[in-house]
Amino acid sequence: YKRQLVFGATGNPFDPAKTCGGSSGGSAVALATGMVPLASGSDYGGSLRTPASFCGVVGIRPSPGVVAAEGRPVGLLPFSVLGPMGRTVDDAYMLLQAQAGTDPHDPFSTAPITDLDSPLEQADLGSIRAMITPDLGSAAMSHAYSSIFADRTSHFRHHFATAIDASPD
């Protein structure tokens, strides 16, 4: 849960008894339930991305300095960043374009990125060795989820030079 003293816990939009994923969870729930069209949040260790994934929306963690943040403690740089959330990648990207830029009160902010909408280079996945793990070796998974994961990953394994099932040590 995301707990707030006045209003209580914010539950997951798919099952209110479960967590919304973290500190930007209220924004993710508001997006998922149609309360707002766009939202922003901060990300230190997954605070945008985790709630977005738990709530079925998109969260982007920009590189440090892309979105200026006046008043951010210097000790948290470059780990803490501000970023967008949206219902779709296009929505989140649109907000990122609006957020990106410099601020005279943030000495770590970077010059605006002018090529955010340039096409990405095509990656040659055929030269990449991939390790595929459903649980990173530390999270218990039910047989049902393991089966779903195996089915889903079977659709893209062939794109890699090598794809092995393993977990990090």
Where are these regions (language model features)?
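Short glycine/serine-rich loop segments
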Residues: 2-99
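A short helix-breaking turn/cap at a secondary-structure junction
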Residues: 61-147
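Residues at alpha-helix termini
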Residues: 33, 58, 123, 159-160
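Beta-sheet entry/capping signal
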Residues: 37-38, 129, 162
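Acyltransferase
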Residues: 116-120, 144-168
